[in-house]
Amino acid sequence: MGKKNDNTLVKNASFLMIAALISKIIGMLYKSPLSNTLGNSSMGLFNYAQNVYFILLMIASFSIPQAVSKIMAEKLAFKRYRDAQKVFRCALLYVIIMGGVVALFCLFGSSILVPESMSGARLALKMLAPTIFLSGILGTFRGYFQAYRNMLPTSLSQIVEQCFVAVFAILMSAVMLNKFSGAEESVRNAWGAAGATMGTGAGVASALLFMLFVYWVNRKNIKKRLARDTHSRDEATSEVMKNIVLIVMPIILSSFIYNVNGFINSYMYSGIQGFKGLDHDTITSLYAEYGYYMTLINIPLTLASTAPTSMIPEVSAQYAKRDMGSARDKIDRATWISMFISIPCAVGLAVLAGPITRLLFPRTEGAAAQLMMLGVITIILNGNSNISNGVLQGIGKPNIPMINAAIALVVDVAAMAILLLATDLGVYAIVVAMIIYAVVMCLLNERAMKQYMQYKNPWRSAYLNPLLASVPMAVVAGFSYYGIYKLIHSNFISLGIAVVLGVIVYFIVYLAVSKPSDEQFAMMPGGAYLKKIAGKLPL
């Protein structure tokens, strides 16, 4: 039984990891033609609107899939299908109300959310109001199927969403720029950014239609379950709503505190730089460079966090049984897979920052690459803190990461203010503040993990071995890129060869220094295939 559960866990983690990776790659690839279409100023406005949208979405419905799947799973464990269905209906009511309120605030409160120096982003933000409303409904349907341990609909809907986002963002931004081609540049930039945000709406709408279709296909099975249910207690709607709110609100609060630093940093950057006399176009252009950096940095971070996060329920289960040894072992596994991905990605992005940003974002003026080289450490730090956040929440200590995040936020804001007012770092101050925030978060969470679980990070297996393998990888990738580029002067071909050679070297050296177990191979992306290759190598 335990092996079956482990297999299901790995399979669900694989679905989510692959979908997250594909979604992020699509998101990265479409940003390249989008930035070419919009230009840096309009792209900066688009990025700012998306940043504010993310915070509003977090308040409206960010934790709904998690809450729905958790409460429904508790009912389904005892075959209380009607009670589970009532949770689903009440969750829909919750997101309709909350999503509606937040969407209205987005529509009519844009002047509060966006500073004057970024006023061109207000129109784009207003365009995102309907998307906030629809996102909550989409999240509820995703949580419904996750409760049944079926991650495939969620995974496919994420890919569908990103495909529609990519197509419609590029299409509508071009349409809007053409429509307002004769207008002032500031007006044209604002409408270009607004057109790009229409892609986000199209993506959410398409994913929602997909989930509705999946639900419709399964309607007969759903009705059969409800008909044969003899275990449900037919809980009052008010009680179900109360349970949803009690689970959702702490998650929203902690997630808000954990993620709001990005919004605050952006708001402070644009506001203080405007106060210091920097012109509007320079502020938005540099913010576009920051957006390019974030687009690239989020791919390895998402990939490194998805699978470990899906393993956290196993930690909770072992902790509940007071089996601390097994719980610590699960955390070691989650940390190992996260660092196995995070560390080489961070090193590789630092070494090839210039070629990558020039390939994907031809309009970059070079700042994105410099931001990348400065900020890649956040991939490793955030990968670590994402796991510790999940563990502390999973063992019944949700207030601890929330308090730690609040402390880190205060330090972040203070550092950001000093850096912007006392130095000329400008947009680089955002990345420095992000690093400071992540370091504080990691240190505080690690202290809590030691206190409540006597846990110590597996420094050698999780951190040192990937780092040792990443050093020769970086040398090979760097020398091969610049050597090949000198011969053929093709950034694309040189970069492709360098990345492939770097991955091969990393894998071979990692096998030599680490000698991963069968269990570790099973957790790797494409682990079965990699194990076969490893068996043929003389190591």
Where are these regions (language model features)?
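Interfacial/gating helices of multi-pass transporter permease domains
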Residues: 34-55, 189-194, 240-247, 270-297, ...
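Interfacial segments at transmembrane-helix termini and the short loops linking adjacent helices
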Residues: 111-128, 284, 350-379
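N-terminal membrane topogenesis motif
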Residues: 1-26, 82, 86, 231-258, ...
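Membrane-proximal transmembrane or re-entrant/amphipathic helices at the cytosolic face
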Residues: 479-539
